[in-house]
Amino acid sequence: MYAPIALFLSLAELLLYDPSKLPLFGLSFGITAAIAFALFYSGGFGGADSKALMCIALALPFSTEALFKPLIASGISPMSQVLFPLAIFSNAVLFAAASGIYMLFHNVVWNVRHGRKIFEGTLAAESLGKKILVLITGYKVPVAKLQAKWHVYPMEDVVNDGGNPPKRKLVVLPRDEGRSEIVGRLSSAVENGKINDYVWATPGLPMLIFVTAGLIVSLLFGDIVWLLVSFILG
């Protein structure tokens, strides 16, 4: 429902006041839609995240400086003037990256406090890439929390091969499908004393949260990535 209304209002505004921007409107939406689809099919975005980004592109294809300027005037980047949804997206990616830094710091502190290996048992044999992804997107939680919190997803699984300790593997792209089965296997392994109580999990934050934050910050302060680059380059 939101997309048709946004499209109608944007087209009406452009046709009435500035028809010359219609090609740029198509360009802005086309590039944003291409990025949204690519991220969706690669697993980086959920369906709701992709739709939200495309709806934003329909409603706010260009910078809103004509209505009100950001609190930081230099935050209006050349890209945001023509491709405002991409400025929102870049801000969202920046916030997502910041959450990864927080997760990494949290895991280092957890390791120091508990004095355990971060990757125990057969998890130590997993690839470096998988370990890095888990370190910046997940953290250790008791199995009981996995059972109680539906929005927390396991990032490791137990292969019931009869070994003691059993073989464990990292799950870098947790999904709703199979979640309860994985939690059941982890719980059983903990109850039988085959693995420690703390396992890898992720809060499963949708990218939509970061996109929303990116939208608000873009309206209030502008393109944060542009501001950072401008500051670094002097």
Where are these regions (language model features)?
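A membrane-topology feature that recognizes alpha-helical transmembrane segments
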Residues: 1-234
